[in-house]
């Protein structure tokens, strides 16, 4: 990541913290219980926008991509989704809907690569999600998003 890109990333993280942290507090749900709320059944596959629907991760299983995705996850995603991806991060506590449980071995395989790319790119501040998940598509390259998808896939296996 270059200088200007790093500045935008830091600014985005600060902005996300400013939005998410005030919403933190004791939650009514256990961590990760909102996977279905965060990813409504009707959202996959029919509601995935056409430009994302048929995408397939070109970096699937690539150890270098997984390692890079792990680093990006630690800095961008773990505050809400938790260090292991269980939806139990400190910034996600008390948020409605709670961050999705990326370790759910029953649910995650049902989500297409295109769906994950879409959610990372566009975030979740729209129907049917209405979540606080930020849109990372303006800060991350296509490759960086695929690296995240590659790493996220390892969390439920």
Regions found by a protein language model. Give the residues of each.
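Electrostatic cytochrome c docking/interface patches
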Residues: 36-72
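C-terminal motif of bacterial Sec signal peptides marking the signal peptidase cleavage site
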Residues: 21-23
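Periplasmic/extracellular electron-transfer cofactor-ligation site
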Residues: 27-29, 44, 48-51, 70-97, ...
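Residues at secondary-structure transition points
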Residues: 60, 64-67, 93, 107, ...
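Bacterial Sec signal peptide processing site at the extreme N-terminus
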Residues: 25-39
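Alpha-helical transmembrane segments
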Residues: 14-18
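Extracytoplasmic electron-transfer domains, predominantly the class I c-type cytochrome c fold
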Residues: 96-152
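Bacterial N-terminal signal peptides that target proteins for export
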Residues: 2-11
